[in-house]
């Protein structure tokens, strides 16, 4: 009975495979939105203000960071929790594949969230005249919460490594 339960639990990790594949569909959707934004701004490139262009570019950078985060979570999560990726020898391989454990993935995700939040906050500040003060305050508080959380997670991981 014990062996059956252990085998069933171990095999159930494959339930995550479609979830990671679903993230790749999210990446497709993000790519479509990215190019939709470019197609939207290009016809107006000579009439758009500098600040509007910068806001659009920040949106593109934001989407790029989210896309990188999706790729990182997809591949690292799959390798850590489902199965090792079998990539042919002749094919290009990402240098970090197989080297990122759950802790380093967590730290990279936290750092990515801080970067994404920073860009979002910069976009908000560039349009600050149209944003109520209390909303600006909450954006800053939320961003600082992300920064503090990432810092604390990194610090705790360092403490944990020193103890082991």
Curated annotation (Swiss-Prot):
Membrane-spanning segments: 15-35, 53-73, 109-126, 136-156
Coiled coil: none
UniProt keyword Electron transport present: no
GO cellular component, one term: plasma membrane
Subcellular locations according to the entry: Cell membrane
Sequence similarity: Belongs to the UPF0114 family.
Protein name: UPF0114 protein KPK_0696
């Amino acid at each position: 009975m014990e062996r059956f339960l252990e085998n069933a639990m171990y095999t159930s990790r494959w339930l995550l495979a479609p979830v990671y594949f679903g993230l790749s569909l999210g990446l497709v959707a993000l790519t479509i939105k990215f190019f939709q934004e470019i197609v939207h701004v290009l016809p107006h490139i000579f009439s758009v203000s500098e600040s509007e262009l910068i806001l659009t570019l920040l949106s593109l950078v934001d989407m790029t960071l989210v896309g990188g985060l999706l790729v990182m979570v997809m591949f690292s999560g799959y390798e850590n929790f489902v199965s090792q990726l079998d990539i042919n020898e002749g094919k290009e391989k990402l240098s970090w594949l197989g080297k990122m454990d759950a802790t380093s993935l967590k730290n990279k995700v936290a750092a990515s969230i801080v970067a994404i939040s920073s860009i979002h906050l910069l976009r908000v500040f560039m349009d600050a005249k149209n944003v109520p003060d209390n909303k600006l305050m909450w954006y800053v508080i939320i961003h600082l919460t992300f920064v503090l959380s990432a810092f604390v997670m990194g610090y705790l991981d360092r403490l944990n490594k020193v103890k082991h």
